[in-house]
């Protein structure tokens, strides 16, 4: 008798995705982050669901409801900090996942790559709206500053901002709709993840060499299921340590003060995972220019496949491109540091230099170095 997992209409989909899926035999730990992101999403949806049972999206009670969760709800503090630090873990895994894609040429699967960029935007939007919900000082002012950027759009900007706010400032209407969207978006993300995997399974996984691996495939289960479970354990241990030992390490102390529209915090800044984009935004003195640079800092990933000039797919055997890749990582770390600093010298000029180098590296240096490597290999 044929195994039920191969004949049952539902089980055979799961079987062909997670059990009998042929996978390259040489996948390194950098291929673990996809499954880790799945775990992060599950953790966020579950903790978020339980938090939503106790949270109230009203300006008068939002801050107090979060305090109530932490003080009065059984293990509410664990839920709250798992959710807040789970977002940080989510973005760490996201950035490493994207970095892996850039390094090993996974962007050549353009459909999977483009859905991934869409996912990145969706997760960023979700995280931004979630940060507004506790209704602390940084929640309120972060929402005011970032939504206000849309007013830079010519002609419709001001109307658009007021439409998003639901009034003439960030207020009750804004908080209520942000809660509604913050609840909805993770499910849209989950649907997009399905599409992401659908397109990935059309082509099969890439591998570290960038060479087609059809001649050397192994079943996903047990090899990669065990490997993924080890990844889960390591990540969940790190997340637990963060939640139980220093839950506020990555947060902003200003958010423990209730939102006050009459008192601006000395330094308005987003969560750490948006600081690189915030630094790029601030490095351009013009409002519209800054907004465009902010969007392009992520959207530039969409044109990376068009800029692939190398005869090889992966950077595994391209030392010059590897140097540029790590240079790009250093630039992003520099931008993250600058995003958290006040707008004064020398930070302004460092941020502007790093922003220019970020775009130059992706758009100019990498394609040129790839062409140079082709010539060095006499290809």
Swiss-Prot record:
Record keywords: Electron transport, Heme, Iron, Membrane, Metal-binding, Mitochondrion, Mitochondrion inner membrane, Respiratory chain, Transmembrane, Transmembrane helix, Transport, Ubiquinone
Chain positions recorded as heme b b562 binding sites: 83, 182
A GO term, aspect molecular function: metal ion binding
Membrane topology: Multi-pass membrane protein
InterPro entries documented for this protein: Cyt_b/b6_C (IPR005798), Cyt_b/b6_C_sf (IPR036150), Cyt_b/b6_N (IPR005797), Cytb/b6-like_sf (IPR027387), Cytochrome_b (IPR030689), Cytochrome_b_C_euk/bac (IPR048260), Cytochrome_b_N_euk/bac (IPR048259), Di-haem_cyt_TM (IPR016174)
Residues that, per the record, bind heme b b566: 97, 196
Cofactor(s) recorded in Swiss-Prot or TrEMBL: heme b
Annotated a ubiquinone binding sites: 201
Protein name, as recorded: Cytochrome b
Source organism of this protein record: Glossophaga longirostris (Miller's long-tongued bat)
């Amino acid at each position: 008798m044929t195994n039920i997992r191969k004949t049952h209409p539902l089980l055979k989909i799961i079987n062909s995705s997670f059990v009998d899926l042929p996978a390259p035999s040489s996948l390194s730990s950098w291929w673990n982050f996809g499954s880790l992101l799945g775990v992060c999403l599950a953790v966020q949806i579950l903790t978020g669901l339980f938090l939503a049972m106790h949270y109230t999206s009203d300006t008068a009670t939002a801050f107090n409801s979060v305090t109530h969760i932490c003080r009065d709800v059984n293990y509410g503090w664990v839920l709250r900090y798992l959710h807040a630090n789970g977002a940080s873990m989510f973005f760490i895994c996201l950035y490493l996942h994207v970095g892996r894609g850039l390094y090993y040429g996974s962007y050549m699967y353009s459909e999977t790559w483009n859905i991934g960029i869409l996912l990145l935007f969706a997760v960023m939007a979700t995280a931004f709206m979630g940060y507004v919900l506790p209704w602390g000082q940084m929640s309120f002012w972060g929402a005011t500053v970032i939504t206000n950027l849309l007013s830079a759009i010519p002609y419709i900007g001001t109307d658009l901002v007021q439409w998003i706010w639901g009034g003439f400032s960030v207020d009750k209407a804004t908080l209520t709709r942000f809660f509604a969207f913050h609840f909805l978006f993770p499910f849209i993300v989950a649907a997009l993840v399905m599409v992401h995997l659908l397109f990935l399974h059309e082509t099969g996984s890439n591998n570290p060499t960038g060479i087609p691996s059809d001649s050397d495939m192994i079943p996903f289960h047990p090899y990669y299921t065990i490997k993924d479970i080890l990844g889960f354990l390591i990540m969940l241990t790190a997340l637990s340590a963060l939640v139980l030992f220093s839950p506020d390490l990555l947060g902003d102390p200003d958010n423990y003060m209730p939102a006050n529209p009459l008192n601006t915090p000395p330094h308005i800044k987003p969560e750490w995972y948006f600081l690189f984009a915030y630094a790029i935004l601030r490095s351009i003195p013009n409002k519209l220019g800054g907004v465009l640079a902010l969007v392009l800092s992520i959207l530039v990933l969409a044109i990376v496949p068009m800029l692939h000039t190398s005869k090889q797919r992966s950077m595994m055997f391209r030392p010059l491109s590897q140097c540029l890749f790590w240079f790009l990582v250093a630039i992003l770390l520099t931008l993250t540091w600058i995003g958290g600093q006040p707008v004064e010298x020398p930070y302004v000029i460092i941020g502007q230099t790093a922003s220019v180098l970020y775009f130059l590296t992706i758009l100019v240096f990498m394609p040129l170095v790839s062409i140079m490597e082709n010539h060095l290999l006499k290809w």
